[in-house]
Amino acid sequence: MDLYQAIKERRSVRKFKKTPVPKDLLEKIFDIALWAPSGMNRQNWKFFLLTGERKEELVSIASTSFTYLEPQLQKLYAEKPKIIEATRRFFKRLGGAPLVVCAYFEPANAEDMTSFQNVAAAIQNLLLVAHAEGLGSCWMTGPVTVEEEISRFLGVEDMTLVAEIP
């Protein structure tokens, strides 16, 4: 698959096969993700990959973020209650994804937008390579509303959660 095709055809997937992703394929995906550009070449991102019980625990914690998103969804999709219910179901199980990635960055200071952009570029690489390799993904920002709980669970300090990616 060429780059143009990957960019045009990649979609957010919300229902996954239970098939584990081979370790060598994950290494390939993360290797390419980390080739993303970064301001001042800081490369100050960190990715946490969770599977099995740890993934299930994370999903349980992150699913509480739906409570914070529901009022926004009610406004956006007042005429489409099925979308709201589908979103609620997705947050509870993440579509059965076999793994979840949490993407963080280490900020240089309180107003550090460069670091946010750095990790966003790496996430985009990750999503495109996963798609090119036949894997689905979904860039989720909702779980950021429960960042403190997720970070405590992962043992992360002094970093900012940007996304959860099943």
Region spans (language model):
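N-terminal amphipathic, basic helical "cap/leader" segment at the start of enzyme domains
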Residues: 1-96
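Small-aliphatic-rich amphipathic alpha-helix that forms the alpha element of a beta-alpha
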Residues: 29, 33, 101, 106-152
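Short secondary-structure junction motifs
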Residues: 42-45, 132, 162
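A glycine-rich helix N-cap at a beta->alpha junction
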Residues: 67-71, 154-166
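Short, surface-exposed loop/helix-turn segments at secondary-structure junctions
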Residues: 79, 152-154
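Short coil/turn connectors at secondary-structure junctions
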Residues: 96-99, 135, 158-161
